Amino acid sequence: MLFRSQPFKMMKVIGDDNIDKVKNMKKTYQSQKLDCLLTLGGNGTHKTSQLLSEEVLNVIGLPKTIDNDIYGTDVTFGFHTAVDIATDAIDRLHTTANSHSRILLCEIMGNKAGWLTLNAGIAGGADIILIPEIPYDIDKVCKSVLKRSESGKNFSIIAVAEGCFDKEEAKLKKKERARLRAEAGVITATNRIAAQIQQKTQLEARVCVPGHMLRGGSPSAYDRILATQFGV
């Protein structure tokens, strides 16, 4: 079975239908008498492009992902637009965080890469930014929050990448981390972080998840121009 979230992850595995997916795609490619296949997408799409290229087929891959994590590229189209939307979300959270004296955690898409969270966090003026590439220390996070509170700042904004994990989880293999989270009934660490902050600081913490809003809507002018340049 192939799941939609990663439709090409097991492309070479022959499933219950006894069909080799790559060979089937190659057959379709040749039957359509294609000169070249143009693919637009992220890591899964480009993995498929690589598999087809290994079958001596002409393939051109264009990097389209909000994660900005395609190897060998400086920027992917879709990323700039998502940063704009996530930044706007963080901007808006400042108002309610300040008026209600709360710690607000904004969970931003990015399971393996923190580019989106990092850029939106910097642009939106987040006080703390947590990304998958750097395992966090919850005690240091709480210390930073308390330091702001003691200095007279009645709120804090924390930008959290959905794929971030703490230093203890960093010692575990990915599958083990996923298993433990599943047993605890959580997918991301954001709600756990909020609960830990409340427990350790006695300050109210809330979570906001823009989610799939980052993946839709009208593209920014930058992304429109970038995509056009890729296409010519």
How would you name each of these model-derived features?
Residues 7-8, 42-45, 57, 62-69, ...:
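Short, ordered loop/turn segments at secondary-structure junctions
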